[in-house]
């Protein structure tokens, strides 16, 4: 049962990643259909991010009250509804409104599952969990590319992904008893575990000030801010850059944009093994070196 729940959590993170790179992949086509400037994709992305931030800040309190399973199921359902709304949106401003529930749902899933896995599973599962996100993120543009290539338009690309989210919502609802059983097993274990994790059901919610008071938290937040800026910029603008800057066919550009997510997925899968040999600072330096190499190659292609 424990392995079954872990499989459900992995699938949930695949689902979380599915729509993340789709906006960037589809925007060269969407902007024409909606009569919106290319730069306006940033407004949708920022609205989604704002919803994610709000949801993540409330996640700890909501998870302690309702449980990670219920929070995840409701969040995925909210995301599914928002994505279906994307598929029928008549104009740009409706997309902005729908980006709010989309961001709230995505943030709820992300924070709840990260917290749950950190508490109930070994640390290596965190690397695999985020690799699952990468699988979803690289699959999304291919789904959108398929819809565009078949002449169905970007709306059907979003519709396909919303259907997958609905299926996952049903899976999560049926799996709710597994979440409870896992929590009961964790609660019943000996209190003197090596990781020293406190019972998640008895602690009080940790506010923003409490989090910032943790040693190293501020530095980690700054570092993660920089990482997210890099990740979101590449996912949002890679397809537009190739289609508008390099003259690549829009359908091909949508599919090629997923190569960035393939790199993320492979990197996260490999990191689970590399951490057995290298410490955290070495892993961070290795990642920065690879990023710098990629940026240099990008400028090399411009020069060519």
Feature-to-residue mapping (PLM):
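Extracytoplasmic gate region of multi-pass secondary transporters
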Residues: 23-24, 216-258
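Helix-breaking motifs and short loop linkers at transmembrane-helix boundaries and internal kinks
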Residues: 35, 67, 88-90, 247
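Residue-level signature of mid-helix packing/kink "hotspots" within the transmembrane helices
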Residues: 49-53, 57, 138, 264-265, ...
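Conserved MFS/SLC helix-loop-helix module at the cytosolic interface between two early adjacent transmembrane helices
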Residues: 56-79, 83-84
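C-terminal ends and interior cores of transmembrane alpha-helices
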Residues: 78-90, 291-298
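Cytoplasmic helix-loop-helix junction between adjacent transmembrane helices
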Residues: 100-130
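Symmetry-related core transmembrane helices of the 12-TM Major Facilitator Superfamily/SLC fold
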Residues: 158-174
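Conserved small/polar residues in nucleotide/adenosyl-binding loops
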Residues: 299-304
């Amino acid at each position: 049962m424990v392995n079954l729940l872990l499989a459900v959590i992995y699938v949930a993170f695949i689902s979380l990643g599915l729509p993340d790179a789709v906006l960037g992949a589809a925007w060269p086509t969407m902007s024409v259909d909606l009569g919106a400037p290319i730069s306006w994709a940033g407004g949708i992305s920022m609205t989604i991010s704002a919803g994610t931030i709000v949801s993540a800040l409330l996640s700890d309190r909501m998870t302690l009250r309702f449980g990670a399973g219920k929070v995840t199921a409701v969040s995925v359902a909210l995301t599914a509804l928002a994505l279906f709304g994307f598929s029928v949106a008549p104009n740009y401003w409706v997309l902005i409104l729908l980006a709010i529930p989309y961001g709230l749902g995505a943030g709820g899933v992300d924070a709840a599952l990260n917290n749950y896995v950190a508490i109930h599973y070994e640390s290596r599962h965190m690397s695999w969990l985020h690799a699952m996100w990468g699988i979803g993120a690289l699959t999304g543009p291919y789904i959108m590319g398929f819809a565009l290539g078949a002449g169905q338009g970007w709306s059907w690309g979003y519709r396909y992904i919303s259907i997958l989210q609905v299926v996952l919502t049903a899976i999560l609802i049926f799996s709710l008893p597994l979440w409870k059983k896992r929590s009961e097993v964790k609660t019943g274990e000996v209190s003197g575990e090596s990781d020293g994790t406190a019972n998640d059901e008895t602690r009080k919610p940790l506010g923003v000030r409490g989090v910032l008071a943790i040693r190293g938290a501020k530095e980690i937040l700054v570092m993660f801010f920089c990482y997210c800026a890099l990740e979101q910029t590449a996912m949002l603008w890679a397809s537009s850059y190739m289609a508008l800057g390099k003259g690549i066919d829009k359908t091909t550009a949508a599919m090629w944009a997923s190569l960035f997510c393939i790199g993320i997925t492979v990197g996260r899968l490999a990191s689970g093994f590399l951490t057995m040999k290298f410490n955290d600072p070495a892993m961070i330096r290795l990642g920065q070196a690879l990023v710098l190499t990629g940026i240099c190659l990008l400028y090399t292609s411009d020069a060519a």
